[in-house]
Amino acid sequence: MKKLLILAVIAATTFACGTPKTVQESRKVIKGYWSLDNISYDSSGTFNVTLFNDTSVECMEGSSWRFIPNNNTGNYTINNSNCPTGERNFIFTIQEIDPASGLYDFLLKPTNAKGKSETNAGYRLRLAQLGESSMRWEQTVSLDGKPFKINMNFSKIQE
């Protein structure tokens, strides 16, 4: 009887700690190669924005992204010849916020080629939309003490 109770507790814990099905489905959809086509703001004006403590919006637009969900890694390449080009590596996590609305947080942490972070700093974005051919991230930052939203629109290149 005691062994049966222990087995039941282990089974319940295993199922309770598993990744939600919707997050698993998101990982399948995000897998592959994407292009960051457009970056916009929820306010009008001219802004000097540096994304992921790396480079400007102008340099980031047109970049190529690869997501490898089975080990939560990826990379992006800056393609604009007027910018510091090259491949950047990252690790990522998709966290479900609300199953009813389908909202997710997307956590991205820049790393070196070996998957190690020099600063251990990461970025939390809202995965506002994810479909078979398009994806949108939203990042809310503070500008003059008020919320300022950055929208990043991706299109899928290939799986």
Predicted features, each with a name:
Residues D54-V57, G115:
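Extracellular beta-rich ligand/substrate-recognition surface
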Residues G18-S35:
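N-terminal helix-cap/turn-to-beta initiation motif at the start of protein domains
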Residues S40-D42, G62-L130:
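Contiguous, well-ordered beta-strand patches that form the walls/edges
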Residues Y41-T55:
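Flexible, solvent-exposed loop segments that connect beta-strands
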